[in-house]
């Protein structure tokens, strides 16, 4: 077969023109060492801080230390398959997690992968876990209440939508119980909840999920679980992943609530990662940026204005404000609130609910110390009826605690002091509440009205809770319209107050409890 030279050149030209030369340019590095989930990598010259790195066998990591000769990275997930000499590639992406309404009702890990055995989550959107908090101009003041359904909190330490309220106390004082009751209380109120479990036993997380399912709360709740068996990196990043999932709803003009349970364990995990990365330790061996660790997380909880939401959604959502309310939990050691992490978080948040072991052991549950629990912005968000009725409660309690200390030594008390002590005992008893039974606004209003107006002064202390329950049943049966008005308007008009007074007096005459 004879080939013409001109044909050869034409053939080569057509082949070259038809060649698709697409290249995937990515920097590669080599693993130098692997210890406790921390890898040192040589050769990643253009890696970003916080960038996702791809290891062999579909394992991912995050670059945290950018040094002159090497990169310190944490491996997300199982690091046992990573060994010296492995090739590592940059991805050009910051760590992202899936977001959206599809996550509701599911239990996911730090990376947003389903771990509840209900199959994959069909979400199309992702977002980065580390985001800048909304600026000063984008925010609105806190003015709408977030009902926890807990008598002691809604009356004395009210929480508003967009607030950061710390729950602090020793182990086994009911911190998680307060948070879970608050989530259950959001049923039917249009609030999406995110529960982030950090460093807890898998069985404990399972119990919380089961309780949320029993009370129908999982349908509006996302659970992000970083169990004690997960790596330190997964535990420290779980809070940011959960926050991103909550921000999805805030930025679209909806209300969300996020619980971090707890930030003490997150600080421990971050300390472990930092020490393994050979960052210099400071007070209590924490790294120098442990304050920033929590401040950049909690500042993302905010109430944003209509302009922010409209701009974020490109005009799709107009005239709606969004909010993300945070309930961080801190565990103290022997009531020491002046330790490093507790003082940091107290200074960042808008108030704290302090739970005491002594009160818990004395049967006062929830074990809230009203004297040192405060809400710095929630007062502006309190419902009108509760604000009107709860004024005397805090004073009664404070005076009772003060007098009770002196009354131990005094044998002869005057009538005014004795009355004050008796009133205080009844207030303490009334504020007790079983777990998983959050109250509606009208129920709290009725209880506060009864104690403030002296209707409980002649009721035996042991019968207070039975009296309260029977009174509510009486009102449900005979004054349904009244309690519906209080629930709908969140106010107590003069006519309603007169009807309520008559109803309580009628119940006291004929009621059995």
Swiss-Prot record:
GO terms for cellular component: plasma membrane; proton-transporting ATP synthase complex. The record marks 373 as: Required for activity. The keyword Nucleotide-binding applies. Keywords: ATP synthesis, ATP-binding, Cell inner membrane, Cell membrane, CF(1), Hydrogen ion transport, Ion transport, Membrane, Nucleotide-binding, Translocase, Transport. It is found in: Cell inner membrane. Its main location: membrane. It is a peripheral membrane protein. Pfam families: ATP-synt_ab (PF00006), ATP-synt_ab_C (PF00306), ATP-synt_ab_N (PF02874). GO terms for molecular function: ADP binding; ATP binding; proton-transporting ATP synthase activity, rotational mechanism. It catalyses: ATP + H2O + 4 H(+)(in) = ADP + phosphate + 5 H(+)(out). Its EC number is 7.1.2.2. ATP binds at residues 169-176. It is an enzyme of class 7 (translocase). HAMAP family: ATP_synth_alpha_bact. Produces ATP from ADP in the presence of a proton gradient across the membrane. The alpha chain is a regulatory subunit. Belongs to the ATPase alpha/beta chains family. F-type ATPases have 2 components, CF(1) - the catalytic core - and CF(0) - the membrane proton channel. CF(1) has five subunits: alpha(3), beta(3), gamma(1), delta(1), epsilon(1). CF(0) has three main subunits: a(1), b(2) and c(9-12). The alpha and beta chains form an alternating ring which encloses part of the gamma chain. CF(1) is attached to CF(0) by a central stalk formed by the gamma and epsilon chains, while a peripheral stalk is formed by the delta and b chains. This is ATP synthase subunit alpha. The gene is atpA.
């Amino acid at each position: 077969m004879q080939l013409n030279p001109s044909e050869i050149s034409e053939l080569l030209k057509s082949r070259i023109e038809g060649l698709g030369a697409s290249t995937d340019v990515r920097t590669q590095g080599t693993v130098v060492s692997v210890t406790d989930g921390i890898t040192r990598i040589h050769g990643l010259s253009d890696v970003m801080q916080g960038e996702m790195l791809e290891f062999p066998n579909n394992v991912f990591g995050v670059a945290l230390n950018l040094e002159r000769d090497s990169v310190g990275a944490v491996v997300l997930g199982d690091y046992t398959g990573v060994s010296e000499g492995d090739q590592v590639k940059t991805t050009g992406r910051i760590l992202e997690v899936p977001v959206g309404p599809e996550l509701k009702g599911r239990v996911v890990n730090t990376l947003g992968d389903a771990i509840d055995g209900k199959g994959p989550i069909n979400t199309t959107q992702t977002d980065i876990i580390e985001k800048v908090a909304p600026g000063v101009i984008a925010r609105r003041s806190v003015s709408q209440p977030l009902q926890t359904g807990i008598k002691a909190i809604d009356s004395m330490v009210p929480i508003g939508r967009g607030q950061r309220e710390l729950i602090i106390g020793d182990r086994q004082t009911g911190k998680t119980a307060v948070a879970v009751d608050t989530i259950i209380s959001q049923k039917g109120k249009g609030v999406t909840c995110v529960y982030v479990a950090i460093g807890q036993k898998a069985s404990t997380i399972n119990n919380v999920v089961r309780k949320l399912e029993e009370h129908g709360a999982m349908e509006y709740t996302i659970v992000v679980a970083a169990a004690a068996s997960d790596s330190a990196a997964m535990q420290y990043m779980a809070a940011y992943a959960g926050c991103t999932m909550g921000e999805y709803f805030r930025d679209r003009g909806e209300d969300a609530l996020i619980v971090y349970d707890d930030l003490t364990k997150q600080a421990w995990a971050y300390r472990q990662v930092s020490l393994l990365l050979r960052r210099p330790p400071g007070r209590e061996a924490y790294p120098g940026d442990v304050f920033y660790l929590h401040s950049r997380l909690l500042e993302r909880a905010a109430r944003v204005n209509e302009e922010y939401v409209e701009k974020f959604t490109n005009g799709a959502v107009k005239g709606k404000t969004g909010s993300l309310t945070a309930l961080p939990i801190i565990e103290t050691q022997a009531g020491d609130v002046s330790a490093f992490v507790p003082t940091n978080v107290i200074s960042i948040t808008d108030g704290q609910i302090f739970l005491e072991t002594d009160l818990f052991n004395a049967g006062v549950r929830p074990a809230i110390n009203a004297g040192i629990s405060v809400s710095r912005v929630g007062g502006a968000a309190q419902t009108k009826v509760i604000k009107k009725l709860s004024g005397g409660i805090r004073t009664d309690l404070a005076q009772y605690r003060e007098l009770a200390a002196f009354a131990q030594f005094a044998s002869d008390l005057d009538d005014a002091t004795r009355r004050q002590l008796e009133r205080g005992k009844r207030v303490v008893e009334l504020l007790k509440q079983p777990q998983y039974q959050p109250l509606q606004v009208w129920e709290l209003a009725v209880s506060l009205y009864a104690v403030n107006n002296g209707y409980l002064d002649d009721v035996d202390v042991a019968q207070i809770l039975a009296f309260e329950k029977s009174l509510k049943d009486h009102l449900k049966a005979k004054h349904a319209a009244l309690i519906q008005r209080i629930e709908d308007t969140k106010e107590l008009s003069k006519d309603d107050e007169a009807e309520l007074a008559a109803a309580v007096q009628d119940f006291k005459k004929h009621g059995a409890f």
